[in-house]
Amino acid sequence: MALDAGLTRTLRELVLGRSVAALGTLHSNEPFVSMVPYALYGEERQFLIHVSALASHTRDMLAQPRVSLLITAPEGGDIAPQALPRLSVQGDALRLNRAGTDYAPARACYLAHFADAAQMFELADFSLFVIRPVSLRFVAGYGKAFSPTPATLALILGSRN
């Protein structure tokens, strides 16, 4: 089954309409899940997160960069929890170097979505990470599961920051 216009719209609204995701990492070889705000960055529509070195998930990403994100539609209405639209992203987390050429535009992108995070950029323990999608699983409801490519997701989401 292919993504039709309605499913494409559902996926786009899900990712662009939410600002937080569950982040799955490996912590001492055990699964660990936390919550992170995200912004979409670059032409590839990668996921940009800003995290503290004090957080377990930051140390986990540095030790093992393979991560997962889960974005879900909010509960409520007439939709059963099992039928909520959701996107699971498996990807690689890369910490951006503050002196690198990608850092300033990534910082501007993140702050465009989360202006109240500006003061955290002044703290030395916070870092920006880009999560580059490798594989995806989009569930739009019962019997509606798809595995779009990262390139397809980027096209669906558009190329704006």
In which residue ranges do the predicted regions lie?
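Short, structured beta-strand-loop surface elements
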Residues: S56-H113, F126, P133
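An N-terminal domain-cap segment
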Residues: M1-L62
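C-terminal edge-of-domain segments
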Residues: D4-R9, A108-C109, H113-N161
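Surface loops and adjacent helix of pleckstrin homology
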Residues: S52, T72, G141-Y142
